[in-house]
Amino acid sequence: MKMDVSVRAAGCSDDLSSGEADVDPKLLELTADEEKCRSIRRQYRQLMYCVRQNREDIVSSANNSLTEALEEANVLFDGVSRTREAALDARFLVMASDLGKEKAKQLNSDMNFFNQLAFCDFLFLFVGLNWMEGDPDKLSDCDDSIALSFWKAIEKEATSWMVKAETFHFVFGSFKLERSAPKPRLEHQKKVRKMEENGNMPTKLQKLDLSSYPEATEKNVERILGLLQTYFRKYPDTPVSYFEFVIDPNSFSRTVENIFYVSFIVRDGFARIRLDEDRLPILEPMNVNQMGEGNDSSCHGRKQGVISLTLQEWKNIVAAFEISEAMITYSSY
């Protein structure tokens, strides 16, 4: 909403040039939010300025100035809703982390110092041998009973702090660098001998004559080609749907085999695959003239047509085309 506002010189009131109009509540809300954000930014800048001015006191002294500054920043962060204020909060956190790092470096810690003499004196006092502090020469006069009582007292106190004794890790094997030769296994030979003794050996194949068996792929391709040519002779002007010809609704594996065999028929030029008006693949016969057209982009010629087909796609095609019976049967195979 766009308004023309004229301010009087006296500053008493604002008059709208377009006449009397009500101020949009959303505009008032945006103005109030802007004032609130401006106040938060001002307080962040004042807080960072105070921390910079008192940097040496915060680092050197043991007061809680840094903690108080962090608490004040947390209170300010509750009202942060925009990126500008969040950036100021991030800058203050970086400054506070640097100060905390410097204060940590100045801490005096005696954790790494260990006085052996003082520790021994504490042990003597603990077991009740404080009389040794007055005359160190009496150490030479200690008999075995005093030493035994000393170690028993130490053992009793130490075992009370242990839930269980430490386990001993055994080392197995040889320490020699050279590896010993592996022993031969005789299990397989024993099994073969047992099978020979029991007479359970399978019949051995003496000779395989492949000449008496025609190649299965060539045989199936010729049989499917005969089915396709029979259909073309019966319906010379009607191409057959590719999916209806190769899909076997009762067997996914047979469908894959049919696709494989039909690809050889397409490769040898006895049929071709093209898309119909519905963009679905169809099979149609090839005559001599079409087989000779090498420049026709619609003629696939000697190309072998193979498609990928998943089990779910096969189920969808069977349902969509309502295929109930396979055109390629394997009854005589």
From Swiss-Prot:
Q: What is its main location?
A: nucleus
Q: Which GO terms describe its biological process?
A: chromatin looping; DNA repair; double-strand break repair via homologous recombination; protein sumoylation; regulation of telomere maintenance
The organism of origin for this protein: Homo sapiens
What are its GO cellular component terms?
chromosome, telomeric region; cytoplasm; nucleolus; nucleoplasm; nucleus; Smc5-Smc6 complex
Name this polypeptide is given: EP300-interacting inhibitor of differentiation 3
Q: Cross-referenced InterPro entries, in alphabetical order?
A: Nse4/EID, Nse4_C, Nse4_Nse3-bd
- Report the family membership: Belongs to the NSE4 family.
Q: In which tissues is it expressed?
A: Highly expressed in testis.
Q: One Pfam family, please name it.
A: Nse4-Nse3_bdg
Please indicate which superkingdom the organism of origin belongs to. Answer: Eukaryota
Briefly, what is this protein's role? Tissue-specific component of the SMC5-SMC6 complex, a complex involved in repair of DNA double-strand breaks by homologous recombination. The complex may promote sister chromatid homologous recombination by recruiting the SMC1-SMC3 cohesin complex to double-strand breaks. The complex is required for telomere maintenance via recombination and mediates sumoylation of shelterin complex (telosome) components. Acts as a repressor of nuclear receptor-dependent transcription possibly by interfering with CREBBP-dependent coactivation. May function as a coinhibitor of other CREBBP/EP300-dependent transcription factors.
**Could you say which residues form the signal peptide?**
none
List locations, semicolon-separated.
Nucleus; Cytoplasm; Chromosome, Telomere
Q: Does the keyword Nucleus apply?
A: yes
Record bears the keyword rRNA processing: no
Keywords from the named record:
Chromosome, Cytoplasm, DNA damage, DNA recombination, DNA repair, Nucleus, Repressor, Telomere, Transcription, Transcription regulation
* Subunit annotation: Component of the SMC5-SMC6 complex which consists at least of SMC5, SMC6, NSMCE2, NSMCE1, NSMCE4A or EID3 and NSMCE3; EID3 seems to be a testis-specific subunit. NSMCE1, NSMCE4A or EID3 and NSMCE3 probably form a subcomplex that bridges the head domains of the SMC5:SMC6 heterodimer. Homodimer, and heterodimer with EID2. Interacts with the C-terminal region of CREBBP.
